[in-house]
Amino acid sequence: MNKLRQSFRRKKDVYVPEASRPHQWQTDEEGVRTGKCSFPVKYLGHVEVDESRGMHICEDAVKRLKAERKFFKGFFGKTGKKAVKAVLWVSADGLRVVDEKTKDLIVDQTIEKVSFCAPDRNFDRAFSYICRDGTTRRWICHCFMAVKDTGERLSHAVGCAFAACLERKQKREKECGVTATFDASRTTFTREGSFRVTTATEQAEREEIMKQMQDAKKAETDKIVVGSSVAPGNTAPSPSSPTSPTSDATTSLEMNNPHAIPRRHAPIEQLARQGSFRGFPALSQKMSPFKRQLSLRINELPSTMQRKTDFPIKNAVPEVEGEAESISSLCSQITNAFSTPEDPFSSAPMTKPVTVVAPQSPTFQANGTDSAFHVLAKPAHTALAPVAMPVRETNPWAHAPDAANKEIAATCSGTEWGQSSGAASPGLFQAGHRRTPSEADRWLEEVSKSVRAQQPQASAAPLQPVLQPPPPTAISQPASPFQGNAFLTSQPVPVGVVPALQPAFVPAQSYPVANGMPYPAPNVPVVGITPSQMVANVFGTAGHPQAAHPHQSPSLVRQQTFPHYEASSATTSPFFKPPAQHLNGSAAFNGVDDGRLASADRHTEVPTGTCPVDPFEAQWAALENKSKQRTNPSPTNPFSSDLQKTFEIEL
C-alpha cells in the first residue's frame, strides 16, 4: 500500500548543487550579453535600507518583506498581499521585472545604479539587490524569490551583467580616445578626445565620413600628382570639388587626431557673398564693438569706456599755464569746486563757532581826500525792480561769464569768491596756482585800460546830487518799490538801500543768477584811480551792487549819516548793512546776531561832524555784515561759514 501511495505522488527532482551545474551558468553569461537571459520569479517588493552593500542588509530586507506577507495573509485571510509572479530579465543594460500576467513593467533598473547583489543564506531561492533610487536618492533593496532556480544562479547572472557593462564602458572610453597628459613645465592638464557616447547611428555615420575623407585624400593626392606634371600653377582646388578648404582642414585634423569627429560645414557656394549685399558702415567705425571678426571684448564696449572715463576729477581746480585764464574764471572754478548747493551736515546739532573779526586794512584815499563810508537811507527817487524770486541755495557763479565780459567778471568775482568759499584758505589758492606778481600787474593793467577806454561814454551821464532823506512814511512801507540796482531778498521787509549816486562810472551789463534774478554788475569809478585803488575797488564792491559808489569823487561825498533799518533789529549801525540776501539760507554770521559788530553807541545816530571812517575797513565790515546775513553756518555744518579774505595786493 505504501508503495502504491508513493507511486501516485509526484516525484521530486534530485537536488543538484549550483557548483555542479557550470554548463547552465555559461548559458546564462551568453544570454546576458545577448539580452535573452530571463528567470521566473516572485517579486516580494522593495524596502529602504541604510547601507549600500552587505549580505546582512539584503537578508534583513527579505525577512521584513516575508513578515509583512504573513501579517496581511493572517489578517485578511486569503485576500492578503501576495508576491507578484513576474519574469526577471537580466542584460548588460539593466534589470527589468515584467508582470507575468499583465506584462506590465514593474521595475526597470539600470545596471550602473546597482551597488550590490547577493543570494540569501536563510532562503535558498531568495535573491536581492541594492540600488540607488533616482528620484529620492535613497538606498532601496529589491527582493525576489526564484521559482525554478536558486538565488545563487540569479546573483551569478547579475554579476555577469556587471562584467558586460564594465567591458562596454571600457570599450567606449577607448573609442572616444580621451587621454589626459600633465605638463610639468606649465603645470596644466591637457585632455584629448571627447567623453560623448556615440550611438550606433552616429558610429555608422562616422565610419561613412571617415571613408569619404580617405577617398577625398586619395583623390587630392592623385590630382596634385597630375597637376604638378601638367601645370604647376593649376593646383588650387575649385570650390565645388571635394578638395575644398573644408576637406583640407578635416584631413589635417584626421592626421593629427584620428578619433576626432569633424564638424559639419556649409558649402562654399552658400557662404559666397552676393553682389547686392550691403554692409553696415556705421559698425566699422573705431568705437564699434563689431570692428573685428572676434569675440566681443567687454572692456572695449563704448558704454564701458564711457563709464571708465566719466569719473569726477580729484583736483577740480586745474593748474594755471601762462595767461590763458583770467582771475575771474579761476575764482569761478574754485567757487564751483568748494561750494555745495545743499548742506550735508543736517543730522546732529553742534556748537556755534566763534566770531571772525574782519582784518585791518590801510587807510584808503580817493584823489587825496579821505572818503567817508556812511550808511545812507533809502532814496526818494526809486525805480521799479524786477519781481523777487524765491532765493534758492544755489551758487551765483555756477554759470561763469563768457570771454567777452572777462573784465566785468574779474571785477565782480573777487569779493563773492572770498565770501562763498569758506572751506578754502588763501594758502590753498596760492599753492594750487603758481601766481606771479607780473600776472597780477598785467591783469590790473587790462582792467585799467578797459575802464579808461569806456570813460568817454560814461562821462556823458548826468551827475545827480545827493538824494534827500525820505519822509518817515517811506520807512514804514514794507512793500514800497526798491532801487533798480538793489539785490532784492525774498522777504518783504524794509531794508536800507544806498542812494543812486551816479558819478562818472563804467556802465556794465548785468547777468542773470541761477535763481532767476538779474544780478547787476558793479559800478567802477574812473576818476583818476591808482592800481591799488582799483584792487580795493574791485574786491570791496564786487559783491555789493547795493553799495553803488563807496569811493566817490570829493565833490560828491557828503559827510552825512542816515539811520539804517533792518528787519531783525531796530538799532542803527554806522556801517553799511546790505539786505539779508544769503545763499545758504542763514541770516547770521557764525551764530552772532545782527548788530553785535556795531559800535557801542548803537542806539544813537552818528553825528555829522564825526571822524571819517576808514573806507577799506568799512568795506570789510560790510563784507562781514553781508556774510552775517547770508553765510550763517548751519548748526551741524562746520564748513558752511564761507567768509574769507581772498588776497590783498600792495603796490
Swiss-Prot record:
Gene3D superfamilies: Pleckstrin-homology domain (PH domain)/Phosphotyrosine-binding domain (PTB). The modification Phosphoserine is found at residues 194, 244, 276, 295, 425, 438, 634. The modification Phosphothreonine is found at residues 102, 243, 436. One of its GO terms (cellular component) is endosome membrane. Phosphorylated on Ser-276 and Ser-295 by CaMK1. Isoform 1 and isoform 2 are ubiquitinated by LNX leading to their subsequent proteasomal degradation. Ubiquitinated; mediated by SIAH1 and leading to its subsequent proteasomal degradation. Residues 228-255, 419-483, 623-651 are annotated as: Disordered. Residues 33-193 form the PID domain. Regulates clathrin-mediated receptor endocytosis. Plays a role in the process of neurogenesis. Required throughout embryonic neurogenesis to maintain neural progenitor cells, also called radial glial cells (RGCs), by allowing their daughter cells to choose progenitor over neuronal cell fate. Not required for the proliferation of neural progenitor cells before the onset of neurogenesis. Also involved postnatally in the subventricular zone (SVZ) neurogenesis by regulating SVZ neuroblasts survival and ependymal wall integrity. May also mediate local repair of brain ventricular wall damage. This is Protein numb homolog. It comes from Homo sapiens (Human). The lineage of its organism: Eukaryota, Metazoa, Chordata, Craniata, Vertebrata.
